[in-house]
Amino acid sequence: MARIAGINIPDQKHTVIALTSIYGIGKTRSQAICAAAGIAEHVKISELSEEQIDKLRDEVAKYVVEGDLRREVTLSIKRLMDLGTYRGLRHRRGLPVRGQRTKTNARTRKGPRKPIKK
């Protein structure tokens, strides 16, 4: 298994698909990384040479991925909450942030139903 950005990349998958196992890299960014490194998308990770894997590592290092990206997202949400913005209040209350209805639905964000005590 190749190790890129602190993640074990699956050997048996094609390069484009395997790179998407890194948090912060989707299919489009993965294709861009492969193009920049000069690696064909349909080649499996196990077929790559160590030099090609190093090129992939260098290209992935140019992006904010994994722990740094998670930290960045968490800090931006915390900043919204500290500022007291509407979005921050919705995050704090555990409600949908982007204007979805809450009279019905919104169960994923709100959690399981709580029975009404009489």
UniProtKB/Swiss-Prot annotation:
InterPro entries linked to this entry: Rbsml_uS13_C, Ribosomal_uS13, Ribosomal_uS13-like_H2TH, Ribosomal_uS13_bac-type, Ribosomal_uS13_CS
Region span, Disordered: 91-118
Pfam families on file: Ribosomal_S13 (PF00416)
GO molecular function: rRNA binding; structural constituent of ribosome; tRNA binding
Gene Ontology cellular-component annotations: cytosol; small ribosomal subunit
GO BP annotations listed: translation
The keyword Phosphoprotein appears for this protein: no
Domain of life: Bacteria
Keyword annotations: Ribonucleoprotein, Ribosomal protein, RNA-binding, rRNA-binding, tRNA-binding
SUPFAM superfamilies the record matches: S13-like H2TH domain
Gene3D superfamilies hit by this protein: 1.10.8.50, 30s ribosomal protein s13, domain 2 (4.10.910.10)
Keyword Ion transport among UniProt keywords: no
General function of this protein: Located at the top of the head of the 30S subunit, it contacts several helices of the 16S rRNA. In the 70S ribosome it contacts the 23S rRNA (bridge B1a) and protein L5 of the 50S subunit (bridge B1b), connecting the 2 subunits; these bridges are implicated in subunit movement. Contacts the tRNAs in the A and P-sites.
Similarity-based family: Belongs to the universal ribosomal protein uS13 family.
Cross-referenced NCBIfam families: uS13_bact
Subunit record text: Part of the 30S ribosomal subunit. Forms a loose heterodimer with protein S19. Forms two bridges to the 50S subunit in the 70S ribosome.
Full protein name: Small ribosomal subunit protein uS13
Originating organism: Photorhabdus laumondii subsp. laumondii (strain DSM 15139 / CIP 105565 / TT01)
